Amino acid sequence: MSKFTLKVLWLENNIAIAIDQIVGNGTSPLTSYFFWPRNDAWEELKAELESKPWIAERDRIELLNKTTEVINYWQEEGKKHSLSKAQARFPEFIFSGSN
């Protein structure tokens, strides 16, 4: 998955996830942010990735699996843990937000 990274907006009542493509030493936005639980971020992200046929299926699956991990962590642990603990749990992703 080194071609892509998740950007996570860590909020008290929601989590938002976007995907960036890694280009050189930086990133380029690939999707907008999708929110959970306000909307079904996973389903929306899946549809967005499927609309980009140039993304390999294995990359789509890996991105969706990682999205599931982040959403589950937020649901189960997020309200008890700070943004810095979430960053420590998922160091390969880009986090911003509150708490």
Swiss-Prot record:
> Which InterPro entries does UniProt cross-reference here?
PSRP-3/Ycf65_sf (IPR038447), Ribosomal_PSRP3/Ycf65 (IPR006924)
GO biological-process terms attached to the record? translation
One GO MF term attached to the UniProt entry: structural constituent of ribosome
* Alphabetized UniProt keyword annotations: Chloroplast, Plastid, Ribonucleoprotein, Ribosomal protein
Its annotated compartments are: Plastid, Chloroplast
CC annotations in GO: chloroplast; ribonucleoprotein complex; ribosome
Family per similarity comment: Belongs to the chloroplast-specific ribosomal protein cS23 family.
Assembly and partners are described as: Part of the 30S ribosomal subunit.
What is the role of this chain?
Probably a ribosomal protein or a ribosome-associated protein.
Name of protein: Small ribosomal subunit protein cS23
Q: Which gene encodes it?
A: ycf65
